[in-house]
Amino acid sequence: MKTLKKVVTWSLVALLLQSALFFMVDKYYEKTLMNTKVTEVRVYKDSKPQKNIAINIPLDAEKIEASFDGKYISYYENSELTSINTYDGSKHTINAGNNSKLVYSKWLPATNNMILCEQNLNSRRNITFFTYDAENSNKVTPTDTNNHNIILTLNNSADKISNVVLPSSIGIMYIKVLKSNGKNDIFYNDANGKTTTLLSSKNIGNVGAFENKSNLIYDDITNNTVRITNSTWKINNKQTCLLNTDDSDNLYIGVLENGRVRKILYGSIDATIDKLTSLTFKETENKINISITRNGKVYVNNGVKGYVTENATNKKISYKGKLLKITDKAILSLLSGKLLEVNLN
């Protein structure tokens, strides 16, 4: 009996000590956690796999283009548009609708979406607009305020869509049309889906737009100057050309010397001209060799020697084959039908 009492007594003592110990530990960790800085770690499902996947492009492919981050590559083969996911190698054919023909496609500047234009084969003056989301292989048509498809009626069935620019965050669209008489029309599609003619001239060259502003930017090729709609912003007494814009709505223009770029001026059009930053080249450059990424880095391509130079650091980065695109993170090139990538990070 005495032995049983001792066992019970020591069991109770052990239980009390254990409870006290757990209580103290709990309070300690509670206090510690309350005074500990917690860092959130996000794992993005779209992070590129480390394993290299061979991406092959048909040698007879045309209009080979990359999405803004290089995750997707598109090309035409036998008039058929194909999109390839460079992360996993999957392919998707983008088909036109019934009685329609795909006549234009372009990757948007800040998303893995494309803008598509389809011509109605029964009424060839009518062009219907679509967006293609490469992430889910989904093609949809944007609509106006009455839920009607956005359709542009050309003046002539021989007119061609030559460019479409969209400020991604605003919901408007500019469409450049090359007419059969040699002129260019610029159509403006507003946030309500209404389309009007904005400009009509033989003198319109390259066109562009900002990410968060509604202004259209275009080259006036007669006067060799850059113009911006709904703005008095203009550089006088210099021949200039449009190069690009970046994610921060900075405008990049080239100052020309004998048709080649001597220096780059960039900055916000909300500031005065004298506030622009200037980058001067030692030698003039062909504007087609100048790339400006979404994060505002400037690269100059030397296709003969196979390298690009980052302007800020003067660092030369080699690549193989033909340059396809420079993104914020990589240089994409093609060599004998194979997609190659050089990491910039």
Residue positions per predicted region:
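Hydrophobic core register within WD40 beta-propeller blades
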Residues: 64, 105, 164, 207-208, ...
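Long amphipathic alpha-helical scaffold regions
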Residues: 92-116
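Extracytoplasmic/periplasmic ligand-binding sensor domains
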Residues: 54-57, 83, 89, 104, ...
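Signature of short aromatic-glycine-proline-rich micro-motifs recurring in repeat-based ectodomains
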Residues: 60-63, 158-164
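Sequence/structural signature of beta-propeller modules
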Residues: 1-60
